[in-house]
Curated annotation (Swiss-Prot):
Component of the cytochrome b6-f complex, which mediates electron transfer between photosystem II (PSII) and photosystem I (PSI), cyclic electron flow around PSI, and state transitions. Signal peptide: none annotated. The 4 large subunits of the cytochrome b6-f complex are cytochrome b6, subunit IV (17 kDa polypeptide, petD), cytochrome f and the Rieske protein, while the 4 small subunits are petG, petL, petM and petN. The complex functions as a dimer. CDD domains: cytochrome_b_C. The chain crosses the membrane at residues 36-56, 95-115, 131-151. It is found in: Plastid, Chloroplast thylakoid membrane. This is Cytochrome b6-f complex subunit 4. HAMAP family: Cytb6_f_subIV. Keywords: Chloroplast, Electron transport, Membrane, Photosynthesis, Plastid, Thylakoid, Transmembrane, Transmembrane helix, Transport. GO terms for molecular function: electron transporter, transferring electrons within cytochrome b6/f complex of photosystem II activity; electron transporter, transferring electrons within the cyclic electron transport pathway of photosynthesis activity; oxidoreductase activity. Belongs to the cytochrome b family. PetD subfamily.
Length: 160
């Protein structure tokens, strides 16, 4: 689109508009019908062609065939449930595990009240929110990686 929308600076009408101080909104082609009827379908069809081409040239396998007589030793949830699964697996009391999971959104709801978020948009000028984000990300990654390991190595990730 950058090539098709490039203004012709040799055009005397455009030069006159620019000399009067009229900005970039006063030149170029209108979005309707040019973009919506000509450029966007080309982009959409090109994207679909790339996806179909990749699917034909490099098909991904669906997975292992299901065998009802061979149960895996440990059934793991989907990857986005790994931290929650790890909490429930390591905490001995299930009620405590559920309370730990509920405390995460409750703690995140208190962050705006701990500091004035509307005052600054720079994350370095909001140390509480930045610290909560960094520690939460590190804990989620730690728990997620630990969920894929055996229970005896899950909390230390086999490092200690």
């Amino acid at each position: 689109m950058g090539i098709t929308k490039k203004p012709d600076l040799n055009d005397p009408v455009l030069r006159a508009k620019l000399a009067k101080g009229m900005g970039h909104n006063y030149y170029g082609e209108p979005a309707w019908p040019n973009d919506l009827l000509y450029i966007f379908p080309v982009v959409i069809l090109g994207t679909i062609a790339c996806n179909v081409g990749l699917a034909v040239l490099e098909p991904s396998m669906i997975g292992e065939p299901a065998d009802p007589f061979a149960t895996p030793l440990e059934i793991l949830p989907e990857w986005y449930f790994f931290p929650v699964f790890q909490i429930l697996r390591t905490v001995p009391n299930k009620l405590l595990g559920v309370l730990l999971m509920v405390s995460v959104p409750a703690g995140l709801l208190t962050v705006p009240f701990l500091e004035n978020v509307n005052k600054f948009q720079n994350p370095f000028r909001r140390p509480v929110a930045t610290t909560v984000f960094l520690i939460g990300t590190a804990v989620a990654l730690w728990l997620g990686i630990g969920a894929t390991l055996p229970i005896d190595k899950s909390l230390t990730l086999g490092l200690f």
